[in-house]
Amino acid sequence: MKFETEEQKRLREKKERDERIRKRIELGLLKKVLATTVAYNVDDTSGEKPDISGINDWDEYWKHYTEENFTDQHCASCGCSLDASNRVGAHIRLKGEKDGTKDAWIALYCDSCNKSRKPQKVNAESWIVRTKMDKEHENVPTSTDLLMEKLFG
């Protein structure tokens, strides 16, 4: 039988708690983003869709997520400095189509850039919700309504 020291037990419990919080953040942000803004379609052949059920109190997750992840807050479009008064959280991306991880993050826009972004209707068969423009994928906007209809009929 394996015995844990108090320190090992504390570290294990902290790791488990952090993992639960991370999963809740990921699912809560995804649910919020799908319901309120534009999702991006990318070439993803896995067809795997994340489970977004069972999340009710994502304000707590949003607060936790922003405090830990947004140290340098600038608009993803124009690059202006953001604060709580002009910040709009717009997209998250679930990494992991290739390596199996499920890290979530969100792109921030100022009010004016967020209002000027225009979604286009595209095929939502293969998708991953995305945030930052990165070099490995070409981002094609998808309307939220089309994606919600695809997910929930």
Predicted regions located by residue number:
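Short cysteine-rich clusters marking metal-coordination/redox-active sites
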Residues: C75-C78, C110-C113
